[in-house]
Amino acid sequence: MAIKANEISSLIKKQIENFTPDFEVAETGVVTYVGDGIARAYGLENAMSGELVEFSNGVLGMAQNLDATDVGIIVLGDFLSIREGDTVKRTGKIMEIQVGEELIGRVVNPLGQPVDGLGELNTGKTRPVEAKAPGVMQRKSVSEPLQTGLKAIDALVPIGRGQRELIIGDRQTGKTSVAIDAILNQKGQDMICIYVAIGQKESTVRTQVETLRKLGAMDYTIVVTASASQPSPLLYIAPYAGAAMGEEFMYNGKHVLVVYDDLSKQAVAYRELSLLLRRPPGREAYPGDVFYLHSRLLERAAKLSDDLGGGSMTALPFIETQAGDISAYIATNVISITDGQIFLENDLFYSGVRPAIDAGSSVSRVGGAAQIKAMKKVAGTLRLDLASFRELEAFTQFGSDLDEATQAKLNRGRRTVEVLKQPLHKPLAVEKQVLILYALTHGHLDDVPVDDVLDFETKMFDFFDANYAELLNVITETKDLPEEAKLDEAIKAFKNTTNY
């Protein structure tokens, strides 16, 4: 068979015309150091701050330090399998995390990967972990209450949807319990909750998840966990991952509660990373931008304007103090960023006052705007009464001769302290909170022995549920008090049926 040169040349030309180059251009570098969750790489001249990079073993990292000769990278995964001399390449992307309804009821790590053994997750939607907070014109004043179900909080330091309220106190003073109770109380309130556990023991997180599951709260809750055994980079990004998940719901007109437990451990993880990356240390060896670390996170919580759907994201950050020192560096930083703080005190906790809220040091900068009308009426003077009681109580230790007015104030104060106590994982509906506070402030408890106050409360709720449910419904529906004469009459009717 004769070979025709023109046929061969036309075939070659056709092949050349149809050729599509199947190659990828990537800027690569070489790892010069790795250890303790960070790596340094030479050769990534065009890397951007916050850009994701990929190591040769598939582990991702984030560019943090852009130095003249090399790039400081935080490793988002197992850094033990990375070796000096390995290649690392730029991806041209920033870090994103899976978001969406599919995450509800799941426990995930800060990279959005499930750690609960309930199968793979693929939501089909992602959001950047670091995002710009809503601007001034995109926000609206906080006006709707977020009921925590805890009398001491809803009456004294009310929280509104879209607020940032710091929970601060020593270890083992019930900070996590306050947040878990607040999550439990959101059942049926059209609220999605995100619990971010930062640097907690894995056994502790498991206990919290089991509590939420047992009490039906995982139906509207996402748990993000970066446990104490994980590398510092994961502890550092965990709160931002939780905020990104919350923003997805907020920008779709929904209401979200995000609990950051706790930001002290995130600050310590960030300090560790910064020192390893050789950034200049400042006060207490924290880097200069440790304030910005928390402000850019907490500013993402907002009540959006009606034009943007009116959604909200409420933040409950935790800070752990040492020996009750709320003037420490990180504590004062976060106090100045948030819209109020709830201070949990050691002495109160160990004397049996739980939740151990110190009314004098706790404040909500939103205040009455985050309370229903009925609660405003019954709790108006409660805070001042409690503060003056504490003062009088301290004063009476030095003398016993008291006039009747002082004695009456002390008696009312002791009953107030009892009323504000609450058992664990038993959040109370707002109408019942209003009822017991009304009974307290209108003197119906003055003749009840202090030790019997909680028993009186339980029996009164049962009596009202059985005989005066319509009065409770008035509070639920109108958000206002029913006629005072009717309430007084009902409480007296209850007292007549008991020994009080």
UniProtKB/Swiss-Prot annotation:
Binding site for ATP: 169-176
MF (Gene Ontology): ADP binding; ATP binding; proton-transporting ATP synthase activity, rotational mechanism
EC numbers: 7.1.2.2
Membrane topology according to the record: Peripheral membrane protein
Pfam families on file: ATP-synt_ab (PF00006), ATP-synt_ab_C (PF00306), ATP-synt_ab_N (PF02874)
Catalytic activity: ATP + H2O + 4 H(+)(in) = ADP + phosphate + 5 H(+)(out)
One GO CC term, this protein: proton-transporting ATP synthase complex
Site, Required for activity: residue positions: 362
Family named by the database record: Belongs to the ATPase alpha/beta chains family.
HAMAP family listed in its UniProt record: ATP_synth_alpha_bact
Quaternary structure and interacting proteins, as annotated: F-type ATPases have 2 components, CF(1) - the catalytic core - and CF(0) - the membrane proton channel. CF(1) has five subunits: alpha(3), beta(3), gamma(1), delta(1), epsilon(1). CF(0) has three main subunits: a(1), b(2) and c(9-12). The alpha and beta chains form an alternating ring which encloses part of the gamma chain. CF(1) is attached to CF(0) by a central stalk formed by the gamma and epsilon chains, while a peripheral stalk is formed by the delta and b chains.
Functional summary from the UniProt entry: Produces ATP from ADP in the presence of a proton gradient across the membrane. The alpha chain is a regulatory subunit.
Name of the protein this chain belongs to: ATP synthase subunit alpha
Originating organism: Lactococcus lactis subsp. lactis (strain IL1403)
Name of the coding gene: atpA
